[in-house]
Amino acid sequence: MLVSEGRADLRKAASSAHLLLSSTFHQIFPVRDHLKTAIRDSAAALGFDVCRFASASDPWSAGERLAHFVEAGRHGEMGWMETTLERRAHPTAMWDGARSAIVLGLNYGPDHDPLPELADRSAGYISVYARGDDYHEVIKGRLKTLAGQIAARTGEDVKVFVDTAPLMEKPLAQRAGLGWQGKHTNLLSRTHGNWLFLGVILSAAELGPDPPEDEHCGTCTACLDVCPTNAFPAPFQLDARRCLSYLTIEFAGPWPVEFRSATGSRIYGCDDCLAVCPWNKFAAASNESRLQAREALVSPRLADLAALDDAAFRTLFSKSPVKRIGRDRFVRNVLYAIGNSGDADLIPSAQRLLDDPDPVVRDAAEWAVQRLSLR
């Protein structure tokens, strides 16, 4: 073989290899992009407002931050955080086959600023997220439908999560570009403000990540300044033991006295740090029918709530996340609000609960009666 012939063959081989690699590249990435577009279209058809993608296998620091949070005892009585710490550390600790995360957002924005409702001290304040149907039930079926479609398209396994397993959804959402964790530690979106429910599908398929979102809080400290219990030791840090959402929902016993007056009329959750955020000016009200506020759960009268027995409680909060905490814990919260109402006409409502079978309710009733009697 002549040298010139050998060189020609090498050039031909190199050209063929280049064409093969180029063809493979253009086959893989357009297919991947087409697949992601199809998944987004399916998510939108199911009612999701946002659908973005993140790597589930890349390293991250969220697990380390959570460990510091738990080590400092800031998780309070949420012992499940400590027992599931290793599984929460990284998505692959939940499922070592996870390669991609499809992160879904569902807007639950209210149609008005809810904070002025706190001025009516004879009514209870229920967090915006809990005024409609339980979002777990609203989202989970749709996630399963979408996950089935993704599995069929990719031929790879999938797993579904909606705040019911030890998966850290907010860091994944930031990594996927849905928003960023604000100084109040909640997810914040430039298009939906503070009002997004999250769901995650983990897939064994490599779908390719979307760009992450940067933090856009700047010098604003509105969420930190408005907190009625100073639950933020520093920006981007939360001490759950001081948080009214934790106290009204997760904490089972009698509250420390220092927080009872601070709760005002908040009887389930607290929206102060969410609702005060300037980014909410870009948010729209939710159009999801099952998340619309029920009239009975917007500023309900404290006297009516204090009279609830277990059956009436279950009826009033049917399909609502409030039902999860049970009648006794809820009535405890109502009694703290009655004590803060300044309305002496509510004293009989509290007095009737001085003999309640539950000792925590009795303690709250005694506190409410004493507080109102001093006014």
Label each residue range with its predicted role.
Residues 28-216, 255:
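Auxiliary alpha/beta "docking" domains used to position bulky ligands
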Residues 45-48, 222-246, 252, 266-268, ...:
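Iron-sulfur cluster-binding cysteine motifs and their immediate structural context
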Residues 313-316, 343-354, 375:
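Amphipathic alpha-helical scaffolding segments comprising HEAT/armadillo-like alpha-solenoid repeats
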Residues 323, 354-355:
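Alpha-solenoid helical repeat architecture
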Residues 327, 357-358:
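Short inter-helical turns and helix N-cap capping residues of alpha-solenoid HEAT/ARM repeat scaffolds
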Residues 330, 346, 360-362:
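Positions within the helices of HEAT/ARM-like alpha-solenoid repeats
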Residues 331-334, 365:
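Conserved hydrophobic register position within alpha-solenoid helical repeats
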Residues 337-340, 367-371:
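Core register positions within helices of long alpha-helical scaffolds
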